[in-house]
């Protein structure tokens, strides 16, 4: 949240700057606008002077005040004589008194929660308005009494200048919107007003004043302390389990402030700023630490100094340790959690005070009786904090900043700001002997060649401008005479580590819209466009869509219920399935071995929502476990794996072939008075596969399976395997087609005779001869069409008979189509009639009667070899 009034503390902004314009200025340097939150309060809300307040005890024991309040001539009542008189208002606040200046919400005003102010009769009077508290105006949580303007942080001259009827909307900033921006993970420094002000300066050139510069002037100098002079508290950092070799805490700064007034409260201006930032006011010490965090970006934690025993120890948690955090929740800690401990009764680091950088514990917290406060200002490893926050589900404001990276030089300045505010507002005495355990590493110098900007971003930028930009973002820049700079990034920019990072900064601050659009000058070598496999995949999708199927994408996760629904043995299938270590759903821990299993779920959901005739298809990967594959190594986080580790990872991955699957249900045709109302069956799935083959230039072979070898999920008499013909072999199996088993239909609530197919496209690509297809010349000679009807054994497949006709027809065959299948009383048992429509055509001549008679005899002879006779 960005409050323009707060932003003015660090950077000069023009008068009348709106949130809309501020958002545009920040977007220019990469800080994206999320939302502009308009005020929830509308007037009239004015200053009122309490002329009199008459206490009136009530039957319920409560005392209310019947008040007459002067709200200015514009808003005062008018008596019977036309004279302006104060308004009568009921107020139950205990701090109401005559002579006070208060905030009056008049009829027509709207308060947060869409609370409308209207005249109303209460306690025997007409209350013509309301005297408001902080909570009612959305300025804070205080509801113990109404706002008394003399206690609201105004100087005597400012208070005396307040007149009845003055507009409070602007006076208390009630009409000010606030800008919410999105901070990307690499821009953690912008998670503060200090950082946002710097970015506003980078965008507009407005004068920026870093608050840390002034704070550093007042920090106690630790070098040269008198010998034996004790610091506020001893600190020991003992990390015996660093993550990736990086210690969890490389700087811990502790500073005390004593004799703080325990009854002191946060001033109104601070409570208002915290409220507008979305934080709740708690106590002076806690509010100050939150305020400093929002202002500078350094999370702080306040301890009751009298409750903790030194030394403070920063270490990893031990197995079995527990911590009750400030939100009242108990957490079982792990050996990866970084914790802050103290040492009661001399037991070194034995008591856990809090989760470092995430949230403090109940013990040692600041209370209403705390007088001596210890401020913790530390720098923690982002990876360690992020893991702890996620493990314990505590996404605190502190952890959000630490996991994005905090300035390693900011800790003393943040503590100085905190103790100064506590001293000014609570009368405390800041210590001159803080303890600073500093193990931070010096940033590495980046050797940066200026021509990288041109090479990477395409921007022509002169050396002086490059130097100015890098200096302006806080870098120390040296050299440049030969086009090469030595650049030391600032401590608040942990994202700047390589030359490419500096190129990105230069491009960002010049403006991405300034990068010219240029066609690459290097000639394109080799083939462009889609690969052959991509073209085939697209053709398959187009063909299925043209057939009326709708593409679907399903999650690839399956479980026992899916196996059972498809009549599969759970134990056997799970052994050969890839199990996920951290599944999204515990009841689906495996990856699918075929698409049909997950596609069926999509079809079922659509049917349950009242749709009918649902036919879906999906192109996607399946996952086949390899029992001989090596175990996948555990790779470190935030560190690039070695080539050997990547090779081992690749070797352990399961095979992931590309499949296409379809599931068709309901009616085969659109409904209507001309429709046949035929249900989908196996023939529709076979037709779909056949059309796919024709679309991609492959003549698929459909071979019916014997009932005893049909997979359990499929209908034993209406299932076939799909093969790709390959010279010199019996073909390559690439899939299955047919109807689902009736029990599967019932298990999944699918209509009867639901048809499906699944093809292995990876195997198809490997078997195909992918090369340009030579187009056949169009013959100008007339075709000859003849019908053949054969009586054949029922065991003879139509495909086998069709192949015999093709072989006998030779080059004269143009097309063949099965148009009738008959089984009935006119034929003996075990026989059926198969009728084909065949078209013949020669490329170079008109076919003669003699030629056609010869072809017909050849076809008849080939059919007889299969025990099929021509019907006459």
Walk through the language-model features, giving the residues of each:
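Mobile "lid/hinge" segments at catalytic clefts and subdomain interfaces of large enzymes
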Residues: 126-148, 155, 169, 173, ...
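Conserved mixed alpha/beta core segments that line enzyme active sites in large multi-domain catalysts
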Residues: 47-89, 271-272, 289-365
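Beta-rich nucleic-acid/ligand-interaction surfaces
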Residues: 41-44, 217-219, 292, 488, ...
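A carboxyl-terminal module marker
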Residues: 21, 471-478, 617, 645-649, ...
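Class II aminoacyl-tRNA synthetase-like tRNA-binding/catalytic domains
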Residues: 120, 313-366, 521-656, 718, ...
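Glycine/proline-enriched, intrinsically flexible loops and inter-domain linkers
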Residues: 4, 10, 22-24, 52, ...
């Amino acid at each position: 949240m960005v409050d323009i009034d707060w932003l003015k503390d660090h950077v000069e902004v023009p008068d009348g700057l709106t949130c809309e314009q501020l958002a545009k200025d920040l977007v220019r340097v990469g800080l994206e606008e999320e939302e502009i939150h308009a005020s929830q309060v509308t007037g009239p809300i004015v200053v009122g002077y309490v002329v009199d307040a008459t206490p009136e005890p009530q039957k319920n024991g409560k005392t209310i005040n019947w008040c007459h309040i002067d709200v200015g001539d514009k808003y005062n009542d008018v008596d019977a004589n036309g004279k302006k008189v104060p308004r009568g208002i009921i107020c139950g606040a205990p701090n109401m008194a005559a002579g006070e200046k208060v905030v009056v919400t008049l009829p027509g005003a709207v308060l947060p929660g869409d609370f409308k102010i209207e005249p109303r009769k209460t306690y025997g009077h007409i209350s013509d308005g309301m005297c408001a508290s902080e909570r009612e105006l959305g300025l804070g949580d205080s509801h113990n009494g109404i706002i008394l303007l003399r206690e609201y942080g105004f100087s005597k001259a400012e208070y005396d200048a307040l007149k009845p009827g003055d507009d409070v909307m602007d006076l208390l900033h009630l009409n000010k919107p606030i800008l919410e921006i999105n901070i990307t993970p690499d821009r953690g420094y912008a998670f503060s007003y200090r950082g946002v002000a710097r970015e506003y300066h980078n965008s507009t050139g407005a004068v920026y004043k870093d608050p840390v510069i002034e704070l550093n002037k007042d920090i106690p100098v630790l070098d040269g302390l008198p010998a034996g002079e004790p610091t506020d508290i001893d600190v020991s950092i003992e990390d015996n389990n660093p993550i990736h070799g990086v210690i969890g805490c490389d700087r811990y700064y502790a500073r005390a402030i004593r004799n703080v007034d325990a009854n002191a409260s946060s001033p109104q201006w601070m409570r208002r700023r915290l409220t507008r930032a979305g934080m709740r006011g708690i106590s002076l010490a806690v509010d100050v630490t939150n305020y400093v965090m929002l202002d500078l970006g350094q999370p702080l934690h306040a301890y009751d100094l009298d409750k903790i025993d030194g030394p403070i120890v920063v270490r990893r948690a031990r197995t079995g340790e527990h911590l009750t955090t400030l939100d009242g929740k108990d957490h079982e800690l792990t050996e990866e959690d970084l914790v802050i401990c103290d040492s009661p009764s001399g037991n070194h680091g034995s008591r856990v005070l809090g989760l470092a950088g995430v949230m403090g514990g109940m013990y040692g917290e600041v209370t209403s009786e705390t007088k001596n406060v210890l401020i913790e200002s530390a720098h923690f490893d982002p990876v360690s904090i992020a893991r702890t926050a996620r493990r314990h589900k505590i996404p605190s404001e502190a952890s959000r900043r630490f996991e994005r990276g905090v300035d390693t030089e900011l800790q003393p300045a943040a503590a100085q700001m905190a103790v100064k505010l506590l001293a000014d507002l609570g009368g405390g005495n800041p210590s001159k002997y803080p303890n600073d355990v500093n193990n931070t590493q010096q940033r590495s110098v980046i050797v940066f060649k200026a021509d990288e900007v041109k090479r990477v971003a395409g921007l022509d930028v002169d050396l002086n401008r490059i130097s100015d930009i890098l200096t302006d973002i806080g870098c120390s820049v040296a050299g440049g005479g030969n086009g090469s700079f030595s650049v030391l990034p600032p401590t608040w920019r942990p994202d700047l580590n390589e030359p490419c990072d500096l190129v990105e900064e230069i491009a960002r601050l010049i403006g991405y819209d300034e990068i010219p659009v240029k066609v690459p000058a290097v000639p394109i070598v080799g083939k462009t466009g889609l690969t052959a496999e991509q073209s085939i995949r697209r053709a398959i999708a187009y063909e299925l869509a043209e057939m009326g199927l709708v593409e679907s994408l399903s999650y690839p996760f399956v479980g026992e219920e899916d196996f059972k629904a498809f009549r599969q043995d759970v134990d056997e299938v799970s052994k050969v399935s890839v199990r996920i270590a951290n599944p999204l759903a515990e009841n689906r821990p495996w990856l699918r071995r075929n698409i049909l299993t997950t596609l069926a779920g999509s079809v079922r959901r659509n049917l349950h929502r009242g749709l009918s005739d649902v036919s879906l298809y999906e192109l996607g990967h399946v996952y086949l476990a390899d029992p001989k594959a090596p175990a996948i190594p555990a790779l470190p986080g935030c560190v690039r794996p070695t080539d050997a580790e990547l090779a081992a990872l690749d070797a352990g991955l399961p095979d992931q072939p590309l499949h296409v699957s379809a599931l068709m249900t309901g009616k085969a045709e659109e409904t209507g008075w001309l429709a046949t109302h035929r249900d989908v069956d196996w023939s529709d799935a076979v037709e779909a596969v056949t059309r796919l083959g024709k679309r991609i230039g492959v003549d698929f072979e459909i071979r019916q399976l014997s009932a005893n070898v049909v997979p359990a999920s499929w209908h034993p008499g209406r299932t076939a395997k799909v093969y790709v013909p390959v010279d010199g072999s019996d073909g390559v199996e690439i899939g299955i087609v047919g109807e689902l088993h009736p029990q599967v239909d019932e298990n999944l609530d699918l209509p009867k005779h639901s048809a499906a197919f699944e093809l292995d496209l990876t195997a198809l690509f490997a078997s195909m001869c992918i090369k340009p297809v030579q187009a056949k010349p169009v013959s100008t000679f007339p075709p000859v069409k003849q019908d053949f009807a054969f009586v054949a054994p029922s065991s003879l497949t139509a495909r086998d008979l069709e192949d015999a006709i093709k072989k006998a027809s030779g080059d004269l065959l143009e097309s063949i189509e099965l148009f009738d299948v008959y089984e009935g009383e006119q034929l003996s048992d075990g026989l059926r009639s198969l009728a084909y429509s065949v078209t013949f055509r020669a490329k170079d001549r008109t076919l003669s009667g003699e030629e056609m008679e010869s072809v017909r005899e050849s076809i008849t002879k080939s059919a007889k070899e299969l025990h099929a006779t021509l019907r006459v």
